[in-house]
Amino acid sequence: MAAPLVTLPLHEALLEARRRGVPHIDASLDLGRTREAVAIGEHRWGGATGTYPYLETCRDRTIYHWTGDRFEPVARYGDALVKLVPTEWGPPTFEIDGIKMLPTAKVSPFEDARTKVGLVEPRGRRVLDTCGGLGYFAAGCLEAGAAGIVSFEKSEDVLWLRTLNPWSPDPDAPEHGGRLQLRQGDVSQEIERLPDAGFNAILHDPPRFGIAGELYSQAFYDQLARVLRKGGRLFHYTGSPNRLTSGRDVPREVSRRLEKAGFQARLALDGVLAQRR
């Protein structure tokens, strides 16, 4: 069992219980996955994994993890600030330099991923997950009965976030039966090493065009067509960029390139759904 993750609502609930002299509260220490009885003391509070000090400062939109002697934000400062961010739904999103990587306005990012996974019908299929992120696409595929998933993630920092996020699937978990392979690497390069027609379905959730233009290129789409079997489905997340401010219609540009690569494509949800011809 992992050490607790603390957010501002949990921190405030702990302090309020201490103020009122309540000996226990029912709370989630893993971002909403489970709930447990939490003991409230004057200087420390405790759950199933031990007792912990109260935070002196707790910021909104921040998740704190236990390092062994103190709580620290789940964030890393390297080439960019990569941060796990709580949501009202439970499953967190993440940000890179303040840019939110997953939709959270209307639905949980986990549920959003589950809906998109359903478009490619992964049951019994071998799935390529090009940009793994927090692993919510992979989790949806595992849940839906995919035969196997190969997932790439370029960022070492994002992979670190996954180790602390209780909603991210663990490739080594016995219940997954070895069906998830998580590989660190740049999929724009690694895809060239994948076999022809090696997958029945593809989920492509790249960073925005301005950050990772190579993942929207004709050359990359040609590679997606090469590794996908005929009749296989691809969902390509594009978001809904403002055409008036960007001067581009990214979803339709993507559709045209996919058609050229050998797909039949149409707009679906906040992206493009395509089938290999």
Model regions: which residues?
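Conserved class I S-adenosyl-L-methionine
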Residues: 123-134
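Class I S-adenosyl-L-methionine
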Residues: 240-277
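Conserved SAM-binding motif I beta-strand of class I
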Residues: 148-153
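A short glycine-rich, Lys/Arg-flanked "PGG" loop and its adjoining helix->strand segment in the class I
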Residues: 216-230
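S-adenosyl-L-methionine
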Residues: 154-195
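Conserved SAM-binding loop of SAM-dependent methyltransferases across substrates and taxa
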Residues: 134-146
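N-terminal auxiliary segments of SAM/dcSAM-dependent transferases
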Residues: 1-87
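Conserved beta-strand signature within the Rossmann-like core of class I S-adenosyl-L-methionine
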Residues: 231-239
